Curated annotation (Swiss-Prot):
Motif NDxxSxxxD/E motif per record, residues: 228-236
UniProt free text on domains: Contains several highly conserved motifs that are important for catalytic activity including the aspartate-rich 'DDxx(x)D/E' motif and the 'NDxxSxxxD/E' motif, both of which are involved in complexing metal ions to coordinate the binding of the isoprenyl diphosphate substrate in the active site.
Organism domain of life: Eukaryota
Span(s) of short sequence motif DDxx(x)D/E motif: 97-102
UniProt KW Lyase keyword: yes
GO molecular function: lyase activity; metal ion binding
Keyword Lyase among UniProt keywords: yes
Gene3D superfamilies assigned: Farnesyl Diphosphate Synthase
Protein name: Terpene synthase 8
Taxonomy of the source species: Eukaryota, Amoebozoa, Evosea, Eumycetozoa, Dictyostelia
Pfam families documented for this protein: Terpene_syn_C_2
Length: 331
């Protein structure tokens, strides 16, 4: 067992590098967008036209990652127009994350300027103007209130990425400490906000209820972190960052396989707990159709994230690290 507090990961610390990724027990069914093929045809040209990725080699590597595949899993209930623009927002987010935030090129001041629509930065910089153009497109096919909520959650996601980049995660972290340090940077609170633009909104009484807030923050978000960390671990073994709980648990338990098994057990526990929260909400708000719709969407997003993450055709988890990510490997 590890006694020293470590702040960096070294794959060579483990003599036995063999491990089997566990098959998680998923209680819900996944869906897939019927517009995947059609929107895929235009997606490449749209990304290229944004000029968000300056190097041709980086552009080709990004397209190879097939992020639209994950988007097609996460947003299967959207009609074609909503899916087109939600997909564009998600592609934009992936690009900003990979090339502007994860390697610490940009910081909090840059993000705050990005979300000030009247700022000189937005008016003069295509990175800002593209984002607001996407939001306008979403408003045109969705509803204003839900898009305002989406803008807020997009901002919160970027804030979390920057905050986590500044955190000193160490090998003694409990899972709760780790999830608190990650905030919402895994992106699935943002993902849920994306689905809200085309479904009836929850009333404020439910949206602001302590049980609903607790369910999202302490169960829904950690479940996605567990999925992310288990299935992205292969890709992240080269990075010295401890930003994956498999790495932290491996140091604590002395084995990568024991760490994988531990996260699998945590996943089962959190799935059980979130189901209890669903039942509690349905008891507090009986026969509420909007709540039923939102809980169904939440279950579907979890199942879809899981199924895409385990799909060998999804290179973002099964492929090589992007050049932008390689820059931070030995920091």
């Amino acid at each position: 067992m590890q006694e020293e507090i470590l702040y960096k990961w070294n794959y060579d610390d483990f003599k036995d590098k063999k491990f089997k990724i566990p098959k998680l027990n998923m209680p819900w069914d996944y869906k897939f967008s019927p517009y995947f093929e059609e929107i895929s045809l235009e997606n490449r040209e749209w990304i290229k036209g944004t000029k968000l990725i300056s190097e041709e080699s980086d552009f080709e590597k990004f397209v190879y990652l097939k992020t639209i595949l994950m988007n097609s899993y996460l947003y299967p209930h959207c009609n074609k127009e909503v899916f087109r623009y939600i997909n564009r927002l998600n592609e934009y987010i992936y690009i900003v994350d990979d090339f502007y935030l994860e390697d610490n090129v940009k910081g909090q001041e840059w993000v705050d300027e990005l979300f000030d629509r009247n700022s000189k930065f937005v008016k003069e910089n295509y990175i800002g103007s593209i984002m607001w153009e996407i939001f306008d497109d979403i408003i045109s096919v969705g509803n204003d209130g839900a898009t305002d909520y989406l803008i807020k959650k997009t901002h919160e996601w970027m804030d979390s990425v920057i905050l986590f980049n500044s955190k000193k995660v160490n090998s003694k972290f409990t899972f709760e400490e780790y999830t608190n340090s990650r905030g919402v940077d895994v992106g699935m609170i943002f993902g849920l906000a994306c689905t809200k633009v085309h479904i009836p909104p929850l009333c404020d009484e439910i949206e602001n209820h302590p049980v609903y807030i607790d369910m999202l923050a302490n169960y829904y978000n950690p479940i996605h972190l567990l999925i992310n960390d288990i299935y992205s671990f292969n890709k992240e073994t080269k990075s010295v960052r401890l930003g994956n709980y498999v790495k932290i648990a491996a140091y604590q338990l002395g084995s990568i396989q024991l760490a994988m098994d531990h996260l699998s057990k945590l996943f089962d526990e959190y799935i059980g707990k979130i189901q209890e929260k669903f039942a509690e909400l349905e008891k507090i708000f009986p026969n509420n159709k909007d709540l039923e719709t939102h809980l169904y969407i939440i279950k579907t997003i979890i199942a879809c994230n899981f199924n895409c993450s385990t799909n060998p055709n999804y290179p973002r988890y099964y492929g090589e690290v992007l050049e932008a990510e390689l820059k931070i490997i030995n920091e």
